[in-house]
Each structure stands twice: as structure tokens, then as C-alpha cells.
Amino acid sequence: MADFLHTMVRITDPEKSRAFYEALGFTFSRDMDIVRNGEREATNYFFSVGGSENVLELTLNHDGRTYDMGDAYGHIAIAVDDLDETLSRLKEQGIEAEREPYRVREGGSRLCFVRDPDGYRIELIDRSGK
């Protein structure tokens, strides 16, 4: 038997990333420095959501490298209680939806896509049924 534990993405600004994911309903759990040979290589920031055991791990590397997003990454999907309210909170941070919320099929949930502060594409799915 296997369990899905976490998703890790690299970040460049922990404060902006924390504000973004907290606006989506995630809860900051803890941070942890990764130290090798006396040097701090990275800091991991862990977030949980709902009652799930799965966590989101945001990693800030301290080596000064820049990262290419590449074209293999798709998106992370997150269900939110109220899409309009969530988008309003994100707008306060300067985050806009790529396009207006829409339904994939008639009677289906509304959804839209946004980008987090590092450009990762996030799908937001409305649980409210609006």
C-alpha cells in the first residue's frame, strides 16, 4: 500500500508564497532548514489544508540559482469553499485569474486558473455550487 505524502515546489519569496497559499485556505505548519556540512542549503516551508495528511512543501534554496519552469509542469488543483471570495482575497495581493471562472460542463463546478508568486499554475475549483 502506498500513501501520497506531499508536493514540493521551489519558491523565491517565502512571504509572498505564504500569503498566497494562506489566502487559498492552507495553514502554515512549520519550517525546517536543511543544513549540510555546516551550510544552510535550503529552507522548507510546510502547509496543510483541511483534514488531509498531505502537505505542500515550499522550498527556498539558498544557493542563488534560478530555476526554469520548463513545459512539463501542468498545475495543482485546489478545491475552495467559495471561488469568488478566494479570488477577491488573491486580488488584494495583485493575483488575477487567467480568465473569468467557467464551467467545464453544464451543471459542473466553476473553476479558474491563477498563478502563484513564482508562476506555478493553480486550478481553483469552487465547492460552493454557485
Task: Go through each PLM region and give its residues.
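Generic beta-structure capping elements
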Residues: 50, 58-61, 127
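Eukaryotic phosphotyrosine signaling hubs
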Residues: 4-6, 71-76
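Short amphipathic alpha-helices within nucleic acid-binding modules
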Residues: 20, 83-89
